Amino acid sequence: MDFIRAIILGIIEGITEWLPISSTGHLIIADEFIRLNQSAAFKEMFDVVIQLGAILSVVVLYFHKLNPFNKLNPADKQKTPREIQLTWRLWLKVLIAALPAAIIGLPLNDWLDKHFYHFVPVAFMLIIYGVAFIVIERRWVPNHEFSVMDIDRLPYRAALYIGLFQVLSLLPGTSRSGATIVGALLIGVSREVAAEFTFFLGIPVMFGASFIKILHFFKNGNSLNLEQFGVLLVACLVAFGVSMIAIKFLTDYVKKHDFTFFGKYRIVLGIVLLIYAAFKAFLG
């Protein structure tokens, strides 16, 4: 039964990791109705490590763009020295953007999980950023031209600003992609570049978060049995496959549409969650 639940959770992760609607928020919601029959320690680790499947989809889809070494894949189109230089610069921008979340998130990770990993905080963050998306798209973007239309022209300073916005996503329900896209739009980065840079920024952030959770899991004396390994593997594989579709969808979507729809979705979901939380509290 846990393998079926793992498939469902993998689908949820694959869809919500890249759309600006909060994968963590959706997994918290899913846990209320689709609970794995596993220990609390495993479930805590599962919710983070499942992201590895999602992030591997970015590596596969954008391998040529992200790979600075021609010899890694001789069958791939060879890069010019200029293209290799741009790839190294892109990685430097990604690392610069990842630093704020690493510096601030590491010491606060356990405290944030303890105090904000619940329905009500998630609901409020869904609503707040939903409103932010709508206001930015309707009030800010129409009055400001995009100054960055190509990811290779993204300034290092802009990468740092986007990284600072990513810190806000440490609060469950915010959405890592949502926070970075909001920040990117506010500093004049086009929707396409904002989405693409968000994909790349997820690589060090999510690999790092997964490594820390795995380390924490074993450091606390837990062990991973064969069934748990299988559940985790199935969820990651499903998240990988679904993420491939979600990334393609979002890259095509932002070429013709803005993020208003996602803002409305977040607000509706947040309100439904608050009603559910109130109803649950009333029933005791």
Swiss-Prot record:
Main location: membrane
Domain of life per record: Bacteria
Functional summary from the UniProt entry: Catalyzes the dephosphorylation of undecaprenyl diphosphate (UPP). Confers resistance to bacitracin.
A biological process term (GO) from this entry: regulation of cell shape
Note: Bacitracin is thought to be involved in the inhibition of peptidoglycan synthesis by sequestering undecaprenyl diphosphate, thereby reducing the pool of lipid carrier available.
Topology relative to the membrane: Multi-pass membrane protein
EC id: 3.6.1.27
Localization (cell): Cell membrane
Protein name: Undecaprenyl-diphosphatase
Transmembrane segments: 7-27, 44-64, 90-110, 116-136, 167-187, 197-217, 229-249, 259-279
Catalysed reaction equations from the record: di-trans,octa-cis-undecaprenyl diphosphate + H2O = di-trans,octa-cis-undecaprenyl phosphate + phosphate + H(+)
Gene Ontology MF, one: undecaprenyl-diphosphatase activity
Pfam families found in the cross-reference section: BacA
